[in-house]
């Protein structure tokens, strides 16, 4: 403040957000001639011509207890870190918060931003509250420091996709286009906790082997315009005028509303729609756009059949219309709902209905019951994956039952399915919320892709989830054991020296109290009388006196599939526990193993014969 010494000044705190409840805490302002003992907001910047692929940033982790549980306001800057900006042509094109290492000894890992869009151009990197030594470690590079070890580390999954660095949460924008599976996710490239909402991006031709690309959507101003969750689809008929067969992403921009970005080059680049938002957060907007408060748009194409009445002549010409299902809390969280909008051009939307009792990260799709295309049913769910089945007429969803059903359990949240998948497949991926090892350069996991189907059960129509058939391509060695009785004192044992495998077990629990599948790093207990998996009391009924359990084990996590997909459970595993055998024990009686089949799986990052 030295340049204003002797002059009057005023500190003004302005809250311009009217959309939802909130408050600002601003206190303890002090004037002093003594520099405080924390890093001041001194600015460092460097202008350079882009000649390499990445701009890398030295990151220093805080202990997880501090990162996740700070309470003292003075710790806030320690947790949030420092603003970091990339500027091009005088404009901020990337804006993040990062906890930069203050010297080389403090570096835990390096974050990276792609410079591909600025090749040969002059850009400026700028940061505040960093030391000169720390800022000097921000450099151009053709690789990420430590990249030679990625996907080979002892703590990282081998057949579940993980981003190279940074944090992930919700899957986003999942779409199949011209032979390529496009997968996006909520990504914090600068930290191992949530924030800096960016859309990470990877593609695959087989749902197994993934190539990570530069991010697709970025925050670009200070503290707002974060790229929250959304979806992807293909505009086959060019209804929006973005181009035939364009990939179109819908996302929540936290400052303005629901927005669009599109690609005409197969996902190599995405352009934001110039008239964003298409649904506004500004209740004073006079453009005629719909207003709401919420997030996470899901957009699907609703194709007409003979019973449908088209929205208008344009919809009749195209043979259908677009439907947006979006989390809405315009009237408060106590009235949260899934809100349905319709459109013929993706740009202009009309509110049609609300389905109360649903919240963020919603999904809507149609599936045949027992594979019968003449007997389809609609499914709807939100972030917790609890779902309802019913009818949808293009405007309103009508559940055919009270309440919701549950398929997914454990560390599983915010799942999404691939739009436009071939043969009508519904391939689902969820955010596996289990954390990575403290020494890892990434945090968060993605579930293994699984296929959803509908089936007529005795209780009604229910959904199942099973790992995609493509997993068979990862098998390298197989082991079998069958027709073995086992007890507590005489367990059934299968020697196995692998931390990555696909196990299928069928057993008759008989008069036992419990059957225990003992895999080093985890125990799966089946309680016979209660007919449930003990962990979180997951129901799993006997079928003809038998239980079938499939387990995907992968270094630091595992997934349980019960009775051919009737339950799907995601859980963490202690990666330090090496597996040398699988053991089956029975408590309180004798059980019979009818079949145990184990397939060791190779890493999805092994492309060659070795």
Predicted segments — roles?
Residues 19-27, 132-140:
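Edge beta-strands of jelly-roll/beta-sandwich modules across compartments, strongly enriched
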């Amino acid at each position: 403040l030295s340049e204003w010494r002797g002059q009057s000044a005023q500190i003004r705190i302005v809250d311009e957000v009217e959309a939802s409840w909130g408050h600002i805490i601003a206190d303890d302002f002090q004037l002093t001639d003594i520099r405080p003992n924390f890093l001041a907001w001194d600015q460092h910047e460097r202008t350079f011509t882009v000649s390499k692929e990445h701009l890398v940033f030295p990151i220093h982790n805080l202990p997880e207890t501090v990162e996740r549980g700070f309470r003292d306001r003075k710790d806030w800057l320690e947790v949030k870190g420092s603003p970091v900006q990339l500027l091009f042509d005088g404009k901020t094109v990337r804006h993040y918060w990062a906890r930069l290492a203050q010297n080389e000894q403090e570096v835990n890992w390096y974050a990276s931003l792609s410079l591909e869009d600025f090749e040969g151009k002059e850009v400026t990197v700028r940061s505040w509250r960093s030391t000169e030594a720390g800022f000097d470690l921000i450099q151009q590079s053709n690789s990420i420091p430590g990249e030679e070890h990625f996907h080979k580390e002892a703590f990282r999954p081998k057949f579940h996709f993980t981003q190279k660095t940074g944090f992930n949460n919700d899957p986003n924008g999942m779409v199949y286009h011209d032979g390529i599976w496009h997968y996006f996710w909520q990504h914090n490239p600068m930290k191992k906790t949530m924030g800096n909402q960016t859309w990470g991006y990877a593609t695959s031709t087989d749902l197994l082997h993934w190539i990570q690309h530069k991010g697709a959507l970025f925050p670009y101003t200070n503290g707002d315009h974060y790229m929250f969750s959304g979806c992807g689809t293909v505009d086959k008929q060019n209804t929006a005028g973005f181009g035939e067969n364009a990939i179109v992403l819908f996302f929540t921009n936290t400052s303005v509303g629901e927005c669009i970005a599109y690609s005409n080059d197969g996902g190599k680049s995405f352009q934001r729609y110039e008239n964003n938002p298409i649904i506004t957060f500004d209740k004073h907007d006079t453009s005629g756009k719909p207003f709401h408060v919420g997030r996470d748009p899901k957009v699907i194409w609703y194709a007409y059949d003979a019973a449908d009445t088209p929205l208008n002549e344009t919809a009749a010409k195209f043979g259908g219309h677009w439907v947006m299902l979006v989390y809405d809390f315009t009237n408060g969280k106590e009235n949260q709902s899934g809100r349905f909008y319709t459109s013929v051009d993706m740009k202009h939307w009309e509110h049609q209905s609300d389905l109360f009792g649903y919240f963020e990260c919603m999904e809507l799709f149609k599936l045949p019951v027992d594979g019968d295309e003449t007997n389809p049913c609609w499914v709807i769910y939100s972030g917790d994956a609890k779902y309802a089945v019913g009818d949808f007429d293009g405007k309103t969803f009508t559940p055919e039952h009270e309440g919701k059903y549950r398929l997914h359990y454990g560390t599983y949240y915010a799942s999404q399915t691939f739009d436009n998948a071939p043969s009508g497949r519904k391939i689902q991926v969820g955010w596996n919320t289990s954390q990575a090892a403290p020494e890892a350069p990434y945090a968060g996991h993605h579930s293994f892709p699984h296929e959803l189907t509908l089936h007529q059960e005795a209780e009604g129509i229910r959904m199942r989830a099973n790992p995609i058939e493509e997993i068979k391509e990862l098998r390298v060695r197989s082991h079998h054991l069958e027709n073995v009785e086992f007890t507590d004192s005489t367990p059934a044992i299968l020697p196995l020296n692998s931390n990555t495998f696909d196990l299928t077990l069928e057993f008759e629990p008989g008069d036992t109290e419990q059957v225990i599948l003992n895999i080093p790093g985890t125990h799966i207990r089946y309680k016979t009388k209660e007919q449930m998996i003990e962990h979180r009391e997951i129901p799993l009924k006997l079928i003809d006196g038998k239980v079938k359990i499939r387990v995907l084990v992968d270094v630091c996590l595992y997934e349980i599939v019960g009775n051919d997909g009737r339950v799907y459970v995601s859980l963490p595993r202690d990666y330090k526990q090496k597996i040398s055998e699988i053991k089956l024990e029975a408590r309180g009686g004798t059980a019979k193993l009818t079949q145990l089949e184990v397939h060791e799986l190779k890493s999805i990052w092994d492309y060659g014969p070795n």
